[in-house]
Amino acid sequence: MSDKNFDVVVYGATGFTGKLVVEYMLNQYGNDESITWAMAGRSHEKLIAVRDALGVSHDVALLTVDSNDESSIAEMVNQTKCVLTTVGPYQLYGQSIVKQCAANGTDYVDLCGEPGWMHEMINEHAEQAKETGARIVFSCGFDSIPFDLGVYFLQKEVMAQHGKPASNIRGRVRAMNGEFSGGTAASLSATMASLKEKPELFAVLANPFSLSNGFTGPEQAPDSKPVYDEKLETWVAPFFMAPINTKNVHRSNILMDHMYGEDFCYNEMWIQGPGEEGKAAAEFVGSMNPLADAPAPGEGPSKESRENGNYDVLFCADLADGSTIHAAVSGDMDPGYGSTSKMIAESAICLVKECPDLVGGIYTPAPAMGEKLIARLQANAGLDFRLEN
């Protein structure tokens, strides 16, 4: 890939999340001559407007790319080592990019939380990506980096202390402050629409192992109704991102040769508190649609709202002797926009700059980048990975 003009192309640079990625690249790497990057989108005029509004150097190239024109996409893909795309829903706008990256040995990162589409892309392009050396990494935003890397971080500690992994981990969202992503809501709508055309996707969405290359593990703990978590002494509610996060965690386990074990169980829920108040809150959360008030795609919260947001996720490893080891992952901005834009930018740079020995294939964040990405996220992106008593 030494003949590529750029390390990273930010595709979707004129969209709301794309602009946040551009702003982060400018602030974090604008003076770093070892990283070359470009902005790409459908409208040259809008690219100029974003560049000038953010004060991006005119040395940063602007690439006009038509998402409906495969030759236009191929031209972009062949100029860069990695395509960072924020243009979703990916089942509508991502297929040609994945296809071209897999064919041309170009790395790829996205914010995808669409398991049906991911399942199709794995089946169609994973083998070619292995042949060409393309490293394609889905879900490099709030879904699913804090969860995928949180489980990975905790399992590494469990193995260091006990010599073997925990067979059961509970993910528990303790805090999540900030607006939900309009892109997430649009992706959910697109997924619902695709089910009408492809009813076979129901099985993919319902199966926690549907991204696990044919492996079927043990029955997983139910997560679709409020329950009382006896060990934490709190009520927990269904977490709307669990369907994608759990699939990615199980895929990571497969890609790392069952590092967590073939009997591994993982479920993910949202802490609501103890007592009758906690029960009522859990039942309310379980009955609501958290994405109903999400911004429209292309829109998003104010800078103040993003900076005042945060999140905190607890991970509990239940060991055979009855003891539990806890770890937590937290972020310093709202999950859907501020933190997500930093996570995907660091993922792209980590992949290109720090993973020369990673072979081609379709990955989740943990097996692709592991400790290297954790270190970057802690150093640069406001995430904290820690053990707790």
Question: Which residue stretches match the model-derived regions?
Answer:
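N-terminal Rossmann NAD(P)H-binding glycine-rich loop of SDR-like oxidoreductase domains
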Residues: 6-27
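C-terminal catalytic/substrate-binding lobe primarily of soluble NAD(P)-dependent oxidoreductases
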Residues: 18, 131, 156-389
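Conserved glycine-rich Rossmann-like NAD(P)H-binding loop of the short-chain dehydrogenase/reductase
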Residues: 30-46
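Short, conserved SAM-binding/catalytic segment
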Residues: 50-57
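Conserved Rossmann-fold cofactor-binding substructure of NAD(P)-dependent oxidoreductases
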Residues: 64-80, 86-92
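ADP-ribose/adenylate-binding Rossmann-like module
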Residues: 89, 100-118
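Rossmann-fold NAD(P)-binding glycine/threonine-rich loop
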Residues: 112-134
